[in-house]
Amino acid sequence: MKIYLRFVWILIIILNFLLNLFITTNGVIIVNAFKKSLIVAASFASLSLFNSATAELVYKPLEQPVEPAKPDLKIESVNEKFAEKYPNQYNSWRSTANGDGENIIYADEENPRLIVLWGGYAFAKEYNAPRGHFYAVTDVRNILRTGAPKTANDGPQAMACWTCKGPDVPRLIAEWGEKDYFNAKWAKGGPEIVNSIGCADCHDTTSKDFAEGKPALRIARPHVLRALDALEKATAEKDKAEGRPHNNLSFNTAARTEKRAEICANCHVEYYFAGDIKQVTFPWDNGQTVDDIEKYYDDIGFTDWTHSLSKAPMLKAQHPDFEIWSLGMHGKNGVTCVDCHMPKVQGADGKVYTDHQIQNPFEAFDSTCANCHDQSKEKLRDIVTSRKKEVKDVMGRLEDQVVKAHFEAKEAWDAGATKKEMEAALMDIRHAQWRWDYTAASHGGHMHAPEVVLRVLASGLDKVADARTKLAVILTKHGVKTPVQIPDISTADKAWKVMGIDIEKERKAKEEFLKTVVPQWEQQAREKGLLVDPPAQK
């Protein structure tokens, strides 16, 4: 189909050249009419092929298991209760509040194209660079995306938006059961989810092993265990078919190396909110590649939202760090998240412990990178910086092309294009932006697996080229002059205005929410003993 389309357009270009070369000025009107008839004819031919290849998305939710309440499962969510027994681990964990994390980086203000790419979705209101685990609860409260709810049943977001934010989440799932947990508004969790990502997210803190100072790694979120079981099934079948060695990925039976990485898959993964109850689900039934997950979503007809400009059925990637890592050189060589971000260090008391100040490996180079690499810190940093620049450059090109495609699609709709005409181009926009977001939403993909990220971005450029070629045909058919003029989106304020977002209204509502509602949440949490003051530093 692609070859046919390109052949048609090459033919048109050649005919245009010949006509302009040989027809006299007196024949301009005839030439223009002939050129237009050629383009329209090509349009009908190519569009008939496009539309025969694409079906409309209809969401068919996959039925998900729902775990009942488990009142006997005790999860201690207050991180401060472990400070006395494990001071080195606690104090290093608390240090994630320091350094770069103290400052918020407003990514959408640095790159206003994001506001267009997420047009019609809450991410267009505010998107910030990630900070340390210490800030997880604070940041989800503060971000404009969660709105300004006034009651437990109010607001735009689902309870699922809390699911990665701290150990109160598995505690609540155990107390309420998955159905009652997920089938609620985000605001209902406000007085309950007050402890940021910490001890009980990764460790069985009530176990004998933990009491003896052993890691006692545990995943207490049922949906994560189900996802790893599904991934084990998918990858085992692929590895067997392709004659590759296979490592068991089901958490409860996995080896230590796999478990050390899978703990981070509690949160650093791609997921979506499934069904009416908005249940957090990992789309791993086919595997973890960008194509595997795209096929999963396309097969069930899932759409995160409909884009406000193009009307494309969009997908929003979350943060597929575990996926990209596992597909790249570090994952394939068994170098886990803990090896690079949580090295063994010696405390002031002489004890060796795992550093819980999760940070850039270059900050502890001798304990991380130097364990495997013989290059100097400066040499290795130069390599990583160069890879980051390559990724950013290609990512920027893809962003620019997808932004143009959204505006071109809007112009086509405004000119009278039909749903049938637009269907194939919109699917290409969906697939192109999905590839951009799969890479852009990952944390450190340029470091974890640069070859994977660049390959995904390159395929995204192919997809958006297909989209814009199809849109050019549609625009020409409907008499729209090209190139389509793109509004000024050079600043965030200009982009918000173009996209119809009243950012000041959103900010004022959030300010009032933080001033009136959040203090009530914290007071209720203190009364329940869920929120306590940190111990004094010795």
UniProtKB/Swiss-Prot annotation:
Heme c 5 binds at H330, C369, C372, H373. Residues 1-55 form the signal peptide. Coiled coil: none annotated. One of its GO terms (molecular function) is iron ion binding. Pathway: Nitrogen metabolism; nitrate reduction (assimilation). Keywords: Calcium, Electron transport, Heme, Iron, Metal-binding, Oxidoreductase, Periplasm, Signal, Transport. Heme c 3 binds at H133, C264, C267, H268. Disulfide bonds: none annotated. Catalyzes the reduction of nitrite to ammonia, consuming six electrons in the process. This is Cytochrome c-552. It comes from Haemophilus influenzae (strain ATCC 51907 / DSM 11121 / KW20 / Rd).
